[in-house]
């Protein structure tokens, strides 16, 4: 379904502001994007309980492992005056690629994987999103969604985006989900046992 009109107007206004630029990840520049991701993530998430800073090396390793399922034009970065400001990482739903494998990975499954990788996936999953504190409430997240939409709609492939897990303590992300017109899908409960 289309984004609400107000959301779209704000996002387009932000996307065209002077000094603001938006780039999708480029596989041949993974190290630079891993560095930008670390800078954004560590700033955006530092005040959350049990936060552990991410290192560029670890992010680069993760990006390299994600290459088999990654569509580089689903991972977007926002920059303000060339400073990394915001990021959204979205992947094609790997479950759709491997669900028929029944735990096997032979030649037939590898061929199926290649087919599903390019033609058979119609769902995306947002893995992580973050904006540096200094740039929160600038509408960058909205603009990232618009940039994503500009790529995804002409493909006529993806029909659903799951915005993944967002803690009920994260009011900012919950408000972004609401602004996009997202519908609630699942509620997960996390429990811990205290000894």
Question: For each predicted feature, which ranges?
Answer:
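A conserved beta-strand-loop-helix scaffold within acyl/acetyltransferase catalytic domains
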Residues: 24-131
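Conserved acetyl-CoA-binding loop-helix of GNAT-fold acetyltransferases
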Residues: 123-131, 136-152, 179
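Conserved beta-strand-loop-alpha-helix junction that forms the acyl-donor binding cleft
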Residues: 131-136, 162-173
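Conserved acetyl-CoA-binding loop of GNAT-fold acetyltransferases
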Residues: 176-187
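Conserved GNAT acetyl-CoA-binding A-motif
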Residues: 123-124, 152-167
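Flexible glycine/acidic-rich beta-alpha junction loops that bind and position SAM and/or redox cofactors
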Residues: 1, 93-98, 135, 170-171
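Long, positively charged, glycine-interspersed low-complexity recognition regions
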Residues: 163, 187-189
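Acyl-donor-binding surface of acyltransferase catalytic domains
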Residues: 1-24, 189-195
């Amino acid at each position: 379904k289309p984004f609400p009109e107000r959301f779209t107007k704000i996002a387009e206004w932000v996307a065209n502001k002077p000094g603001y630029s938006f780039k999708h990840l480029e596989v041949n520049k993974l190290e630079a994007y891993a560095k930008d991701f670390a800078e954004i993530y560590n700033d955006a998430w530092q005040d959350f309980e049990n936060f552990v800073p991410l290192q560029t090396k670890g992010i680069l390793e993760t990006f390299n492992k994600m290459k088999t399922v990654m569509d580089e034009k689903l991972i977007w970065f926002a920059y303000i005056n060339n400073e990394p400001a915001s990021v959204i990482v979205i992947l094609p739903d790997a479950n759709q690629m491997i669900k028929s494998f029944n735990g096997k990975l032979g030649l037939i499954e590898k061929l199926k994987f290649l087919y599903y990788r390019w033609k058979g996936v119609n769902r995306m999953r947002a893995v992580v999103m973050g904006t540096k504190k200094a740039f929160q409430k600038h509408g960058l997240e909205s603009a990232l969604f618009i940039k994503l939409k500009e790529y995804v709609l002409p493909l006529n492939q993806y029909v659903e985006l799951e915005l993944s897990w967002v803690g009920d303590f994260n009011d900012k992300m919950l408000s972004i989900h609401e602004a996009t017109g997202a519908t609630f899908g699942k509620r997960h409960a996390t429990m811990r046992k205290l000894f």
